[in-house]
Structure formats: structure tokens, C-alpha cells
Amino acid sequence: MSAIREKVNISERRACRLVGLSRSVLHYDAKPDHENEVLAARLVELAHERRRFGYRRLHALVEREGTHANHKRIYRLYREAGLAVRRRRKRQGVMIEREQLALPGAPNEVWSIDFVMDALSNGRRVKCLTVVDDFTKEAVDIVVDHGISGLYVARALDRAARFRGYPKAVRTDQGPEFTSRALDQWAYANGVTLKLIQAGKPTQNAYIESFNGKFRDECLNEHWFTTLAHARAVIAAWRQDYNEQRPHSALNYLAPSEFAAKHRATADAPAAFQELV
């Protein structure tokens, strides 16, 4: 409007009349929506607590708290607050064809296991054995130590099985710990099939590779461990949060434990119905 007035040298009243605009509309000062202010403040708070979460996971968290908002609205507030997650630079590698893994139909059908390396502040190496249920996406265990042998792996899997039963199969790469006699004997004794992926084809173990990426990005890269005990405590807390709170995109943004509980309830329903009949 000011541009029109300057160009033809007329009053504000006449300019408004010529373009059919009310002067009250011209001077209307939009008041910020209190609901949006509260929601934006909560998004900022959650983003500071979970620095590596994008707007989709933050949306899932506020929905879980009872705040129902369209994802477009969440994205707008997220961008306006300058909360876009800075992507870490990935190493350039050779392009390889991804292979689609068959999704198991129930918990404990297939566990995937792998190692993730890190270091303490003094430079000493830390080795993390990650164990994931391919169906529920639960982090069954994350074992942290300076060294982990094949026998150590077998004992760790035994410990996990005490709480949730033995898996039908375990998928691994061909690392020496996973091709050891100790793990082979453990699998035979417990009726577990060992599924070894082909050498040089990590995409055949895509579920654990995806988990390891999240583990490194959201936990290992966010902390500076001073001792082995410190590393174990932080990683255990992250694993619990991952299982019980973190929205998982492959599970329609349910947390893995929440998804597993809903699956158990659904699976138990037919049996309960039969008992009533």
C-alpha cells in the first residue's frame, strides 16, 4: 500500500478506497496464537532434550503427550524455531545395491547381532555388542567391554534369553567372534540357527546396521566416556529410552516396547477367546 501511495501521491484513505481495502484491515496486527506459542515452546524443549530428533519424531512425542496437531503445523513451527537437525557428514563409499530383508512375523524369530567400536577419553578402545530383535526392533542388549570373545558373545545371548526366550535364528557377519566354536556350540545346544551373511555385504544385515547408525548418532557421538563404567551406565540408559520412549518410523512411530506389547495383546486375544468359548 505504501508503494502505491508513493507512486501516485495520494492519501492512505483514498488508496484503500481505490483497491477496495478497509483501513482497519490494513492496520490489523495479528496477535500470536497462544496455542502455537505453547506448542512451539514444547518443541524447542524436546529438541534440546533430544538433539538428533527431526520433526517427525518430535511430532510423535507431542502426540503421545496428548497434543494433537497436523504434521504440517508441526513442521512449520519446527522450521520457524530453527530446529532443523544438522546432518552429520557421511563418508563417501562405493555404491552398492541394497537387498530387501524378509521381515520376521513374530518376536524372537530372528535376532541380529554386530559390533560397534568406540573409545574412552584416554583412548582405550571400547567394544559394544549390539543385539536387536528384527521384528519388534527392540534392543535386546548392548554389551560393553574392552574385549568380547566368541564365548563372551554366547554368554551374553544366554543372559538375554533368560528374560525373553531363545530366538529361532541369529543373523551375524563372518567376524571371528561369530564364527567361533563357542558360538557354534551355543547355537547347537539351544536349537538356534546361525545365519551368516556373505562377506563384504553388510546390507544383508540391514536391520542391525540401521540400529547401529542410530546408536552411534544419538548416543556414542553425543557423549564423551571417561571410564568403562561411565560408558556402560550411559549406554544402558540410552537403550532403555530407545526401547520404551523413542518413536520408531518402521513401527508407525511407536516405541519398540510399546509395539511388542501391542503385538502380544493381539496374539493372545484369539487364545483368550477360545478359553471363553
UniProtKB/Swiss-Prot annotation:
Transmembrane segments: none annotated. This is Insertion element IS407 uncharacterized 31.7 kDa protein. Keywords: Transposable element. It holds the Pfam family HTH_21. The keyword Ribonucleoprotein does not apply. GO terms for molecular function: nucleic acid binding. One of its GO terms (biological process) is DNA integration.
